[in-house]
């Protein structure tokens, strides 16, 4: 297991259970006590957890792990969702994407569509995610519109009054919205961070 994967697994445990003990890390991840301590120290240095005697607890000021740690979680499912979503996109379409790991994968799959080869008929992509805008801006067949706003460090999304001012003047044909959860009524949840 790579260092990144260990850190992601430890963050998952802490987010799900509220805390983790070094013995749990040793047992669950099959690492030495020294490796478990180093991993917790690294995550504490990044302010993702708060160290305790023999373990760590969730950082009370951080309710959402950074995007780089959420990317590998359920990667196969995200790829399947992304491929299905990208199949709905055609040259000339106007689409919207918010930030998140799944919508980042959707953007990557859109960029790989064989039908998007004519720069004269680009897809217009509206996003509030600077990481998605960065990846897509170099694509000749994608025109990128960024909403503006204040950057959220953990998700790379632009939010706030500036984004709220521009959104009413933008129209998209298809919106791919990444959320944290969905209930049986279709209501969604999203981190506020």
Write out the residue ranges for each language-model feature.
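HTH-adjacent hinge/linker in prokaryotic transcriptional regulators
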Residues: 2-7, 15-23, 27-30, 34-101, ...
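Conserved phosphate- and dinucleotide-binding cores of soluble alpha/beta proteins
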Residues: 2-25, 29-34, 44-45, 77, ...
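Short, active-site-adjacent cap segments at secondary-structure transitions
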Residues: 57-58, 102-105, 132-133, 182-184
């Amino acid at each position: 297991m790579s260092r990144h994967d260990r850190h992601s697994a430890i963050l998952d445990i802490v987010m799900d259970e509220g805390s983790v003990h070094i013995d749990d890390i040793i047992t669950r991840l099959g690492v030495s006590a020294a490796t478990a301590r180093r991993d917790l120290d690294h995550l504490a240095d990044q302010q993702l957890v708060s160290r305790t005697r023999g373990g760590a607890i969730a950082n009370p000021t951080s309710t959402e792990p950074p995007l780089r740690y959420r990317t590998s979680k359920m990667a196969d499912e995200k790829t399947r969702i992304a491929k299905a979503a990208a199949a709905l996109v055609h040259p000339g379409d106007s689409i919207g994407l918010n930030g998140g790991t799944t919508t980042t994968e959707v953007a990557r799959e859109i960029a790989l569509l064989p039908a998007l080869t004519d720069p004269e008929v680009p897809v217009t992509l509206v996003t509030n995610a600077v990481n998605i805008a960065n990846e897509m801006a170099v694509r000749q067949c994608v025109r990128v519109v960024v909403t503006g706003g204040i950057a959220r460090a953990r998700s790379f999304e632009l939010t706030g009054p500036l984004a709220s001012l521009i959104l009413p003047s933008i129209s998209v044909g298809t919106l791919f919205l990444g959320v944290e959860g969905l209930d049986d009524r279709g209501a969604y949840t999203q981190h506020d961070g």
